[in-house]
A protein has these predicted regions:
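Short, hydrophobic transmembrane alpha-helix segments
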Residues: 26-36, 56-58
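Structural signature of hydrophobic alpha-helical transmembrane segments
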Residues: 33-44, 80, 86-92
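Interfacial segments of multi-pass membrane proteins
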Residues: 52-53, 116-127
């Protein structure tokens, strides 16, 4: 029996690693061929760790991944418009992002980097759409597809 569990656990680890590899590969590839848009931001790597390695965690649920990223990026863009690039704008943006994720029950820790990226990079509202919303949606769809393929009897919680 131990051998059977050992094999199953290792297969799940391989599927998780392969899933993360493929997902970040495609996002990186799109980033390399699209000269007008940025597709890849560092928080996506952290999101993939949660989504692929601990997909049952409340923090890795599709709703949290998608809306956590959008709310956090929006917070950063808003504070940049209001206060520019300053220590207070970065601090307020991150605090506001945490507040929004808590009240909407969409906490996703990797998204906490988005307000900092938005302010330091002087990002506009377009940053929320591309790469944040587009990338987060890609990660969610990719992860749900992989979970459905590897565990066909598991319902897709969205």
């Amino acid at each position: 029996m131990k051998f059977k569990n050992f094999f199953k656990d290792n297969i799940n680890i391989l599927i998780s690693c392969l899933g993360a590899f493929l997902c970040i590969f495609f996002i990186s590839y799109f980033n390399s061929i699209d000269e007008t848009n940025i597709w890849l931001i560092p928080p996506f790597g952290a999101s993939l760790v949660l989504v692929m390695a601990v997909h049952d965690s409340p923090l890795a649920q599709p709703r949290n991944v998608f809306f956590g990223h959008i709310l956090s990026a929006s917070s950063g863009v808003l504070m940049f418009y209001l206060l520019g690039n300053s220590p207070i704008s970065i601090s307020l943006a991150l605090s506001f992002a945490i507040f929004l994720m808590i009240i909407t029950k969409t906490i996703h820790p990797p998204a906490g980097a988005n307000p900092i990226i938005a302010i330091l990079g002087a990002k506009t509202i377009e940053f929320v759409i591309m790469p944040v919303a587009t990338g987060a949606l890609f990660i969610v769809i990719f992860a749900l597809s992989l979970i459905h393929i590897s565990e066909p009897t598991r319902p897709l919680d969205i």
